Design a protein with these regions (language model features):
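Histidine-/acidic-rich catalytic cores in large beta-rich domains
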Residues: 1-260
Length: 260
C-alpha cells in the first residue's frame, strides 16, 4: 500500500522542568525535562521519547478501551484508565503544562474528533484508513501517571446538546494561561477562545482572513505571549469588560436598546 503522511506528527516538544521528575527522578524517569513528547494524529497515539536512550517511555493509544494497555517508564499498565479517559481521535498539540502554571505537570490535548486511525474497513472507510470517526471536539487535561481526567472543555461541559458546536476536525491547540484560563484554537473554523476552568467563554476572536474562494479562515495554532515579547509595541492599557445582557441588543444605526 502506498500512502503519504501515514503518521501525521503535529507537535513535538521537550517536557521541560516538572514536579514529577523533581519529586522522584527514578520513579518518574519518563518525565525527565529533556525528554520529548510527541503527538501523532493519524495513529491516535501520544508518547514520550527518552532523549538519551531513544526509547519510548510513556505511551497512550491508539485504542482507549477499558482493557487497553498503556505504558509508563516503558512498562505496560493495565486497568480501566484509558476507558475512563475516553477514545481520542485525530488529536493535536499533546504537551505537558509547564511549571509555574495552574495544572503544571498534567498533559493537555486538543482531541479533535473528525477522522483518524487504522482498522477494519467499514462503509465509512472501505480501505480501513481513518476508520475512527466522531463529530465533536474536546480539550482534555489529565494526570500522566494515573490518566485521571482533571478537566475537559467541550460542547457537553458548556451545557450544549449538539456536539458539533465545539468542533474542529483538524489543526487546533490549547494553551494554559497564568490566570488559570485556557486559550483554545478551534483552527478549522478560525476561532480563538479563552475559557475559564468553569467552561465560561470570556474572550473570543474569529479570523476575518479567508482564502480566495471565501470558504476557509483556518488558523493552525495560536499562543498568547507576554507584551515584552514585542518590545517595539507600546504595552496597551488593559480594562475589565462587563458581559452584556443576553436579552439586550441594538439594532444597527439605532441608539435605542431593544429588550426582549
Amino acid at each position: 500500500v502506498k500512502a503519504a503522511d501515514w503518521i501525521h506528527c503535529n507537535s513535538m516538544s521537550e517536557l521541560g522542568p516538572n514536579h514529577w521528575y523533581t519529586e522522584d527522578p527514578v520513579k518518574y524517569s519518563a518525565f525527565h525535562p529533556n525528554n520529548i513528547i510527541v503527538s501523532n494524529r493519524q495513529t491516535q497515539t501520544s508518547f514520550i521519547i527518552d532523549k538519551k536512550t531513544k526509547k519510548i517511555v510513556w505511551h497512550i493509544g491508539p485504542d482507549y478501551y477499558s482493557d487497553s494497555v498503556w505504558y509508563l517508564n516503558g512498562e505496560p499498565q493495565k486497568g480501566r484508565a484509558l476507558g475512563r479517559l475516553g477514545q481520542i481521535v485525530g488529536q493535536h498539540h499533546t504537551h505537558m503544562i509547564p511549571d509555574g502554571l495552574p495544572g503544571a505537570g498534567n498533559i493537555m490535548i486538543y482531541d479533535n474528533g473528525g477522522y483518524s486511525g487504522y482498522g477494519p474497513r467499514n462503509p465509512a472507510t472501505p480501505t480501513g484508513w481513518s476508520n475512527s470517526r466522531r463529530d465533536y471536539s474536546r480539550v482534555i487535561e489529565f494526570n500522566p501517571v494515573t490518566l485521571e481526567k482533571v478537566w475537559e472543555h467541550s460542547a457537553a461541559t458548556m451545557g450544549l446538546r449538539e456536539g458539533y458546536k465545539f468542533y474542529s476536525d483538524y489543526v487546533s491547540s490549547a494553551q494554559r494561561l497564568p490566570n488559570g484560563n485556557t486559550l483554545i484554537t478551534n483552527g478549522a473554523v478560525g476561532q480563538l477562545q479563552e475559557v475559564t476552568p468553569d467552561n465560561e467563554i470570556v474572550w473570543g476572536y474569529i479570523s476575518p482572513w479567508y482564502n480566495p474562494n471565501g470558504k476557509f479562515n483556518l488558523v493552525y495554532r495560536a499562543y498568547r505571549v507576554p507584551y515584552d515579547y514585542v518590545p517595539q509595541i507600546k504595552k496597551p492599557e488593559e480594562y475589565a469588560v462587563t458581559p452584556p445582557e443576553n436579552a439586550e441588543w441594538r439594532i444597527p444605526a439605532s441608539k435605542t436598546p431593544y429588550k426582549g
